[in-house]
Amino acid sequence: LIVIIGVVMVMFCKKQGIKKIGEVILGFGILFMGLSIMGDSMEAVKESPQMIEFLASLTNPFAAILTGFAITAVLQSSSATVGIILLMVSQNLLEFTICPFMILGCNIGSCVSARVASLSGKKDAKRAALIHLLFNVIGSAVMFLILLLAIDPFTDMMLYISGGNLARSVANVHTLMK
């Protein structure tokens, strides 16, 4: 319904301001439609023995960081990866206690596209991408140490401030670590 409203506003309205609002509405509609499709597709993941075994084996924080990094590097969007993590936690495919580590990997993985883009750029572009990478790696390393020492109190706090809602807790962890 949101997509249809956005399309109608973009296609049939003559005022530029209304068209821009229609584009925003259309964008949100497509975003929510994509999240719904991803949520529905997680049902197939639930039945895949290989995926269940892989996700069950994600108890090692280092493996979780590498997984978050790899998915984000491929998708080139930490927000999309966090959305996938959020859906997987909501569907009980992934333990909530491993999510903060995956999100640390997402933060580091988000630097890949900037590093690749800087390869053909000038010296300042390369420096900016390197500083972005170093900032995220150092920040993630500090947070990693904190999580190793206090993962249970951290996840309990996130669940408490999120009203026990796992999906909201994942979003709050991502917000906190950004």
Predicted regions and their residues:
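C-terminal ends of transmembrane helices
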Residues: 6-19, 114-120
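Helix-loop-helix hairpins and the membrane-proximal interhelical loops
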Residues: 24-70, 88-91
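Generic alpha-helical transmembrane segments of integral inner-membrane proteins
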Residues: 4-8, 25, 62, 66, ...
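Membrane-water interface of transmembrane alpha-helices in multipass transporters/channels
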Residues: 18-23, 59, 93-101, 163-168
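Juxtamembrane transmembrane-helix boundary motif
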Residues: 7, 11, 31, 43, ...
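Transmembrane helix-bundle signature of multi-pass membrane transporters/permeases
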Residues: 1, 26-29, 33, 69-75, ...
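Membrane-interfacial helix-loop connectors
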Residues: 1, 6, 72-109, 118-120, ...
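Transmembrane alpha-helical segments and their short flanking loops
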Residues: 35, 46-57, 119-177
